[in-house]
């Protein structure tokens, strides 16, 4: 195993992540540069859908990444897809998640604390904070190093990896 030669102290140092030590990344995604899509990602395990797989502060992912998103009222993200399942699990506040088809038909799902949605691979989805308070929620994806999200909007899709140039 990869930890065979490590002491318990070394394992604890590398495989424990604390909220206070995770820096919020306000440029984790290309669409986060746009008003209405601003949000911060705190990476605990891996990089999630940000594509920032070189983040040495996060615990190395094996089977899945885990991050915490912070979203102010009125903000969210652009409709997008992944090649793997994505889960939003609300910790604090309220979040409106959505799924939509290729024609733009959308279903909104209001989630509160301790509620979640699992978005299947290839299904267009996203979220917005329509409440008056910030929301914190956990995000997990179904592969250790998923590809950068694919945006439904062609104008966002083309530069979807530009944010990685400054990473």
Indicate residue ranges for each PLM-predicted region.
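A structural connector/turn signal
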Residues: 66, 76, 85, 106, ...
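Short beta-strand His + acidic residue motifs that chelate non-heme Fe in jelly-roll/DSBH
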Residues: 77-80, 97-99, 119, 125-131
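Double-stranded beta-helix
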Residues: 1, 10, 124-167
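Short, conserved beta-strand element in jelly-roll/cupin
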Residues: 63, 68-73, 81-101, 140-143
């Amino acid at each position: 195993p990869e930890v065979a030669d490590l002491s318990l102290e070394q394992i604890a140092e590398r495989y424990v992540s604390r909220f206070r030590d995770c820096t919020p990344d306000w440029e984790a995604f290309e669409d986060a540069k746009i008003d209405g899509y601003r949000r911060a990602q705190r990476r605990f395990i891996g990089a999630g859908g940000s594509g920032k797989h070189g983040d040495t502060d996060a615990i190395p992912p094996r089977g899945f990444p885990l991050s915490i998103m912070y979203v102010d009222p009125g903000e969210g993200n652009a409709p997008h897809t992944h090649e793997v399942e994505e889960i939003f699990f609300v910790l604090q506040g309220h979040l409106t998640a959505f799924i939509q088809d290729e024609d733009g038909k959308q279903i909104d799902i209001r989630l509160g604390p301790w509620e979640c949605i699992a978005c299947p691979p290839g299904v267009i989805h996203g979220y917005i904070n329509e409440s008056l308070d910030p929301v914190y929620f956990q995000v997990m994806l179904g592969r250790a190093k998923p590809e950068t999200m694919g945006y439904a909007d062609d104008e966002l899709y083309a530069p979807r990896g530009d944010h990685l140039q400054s990473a």
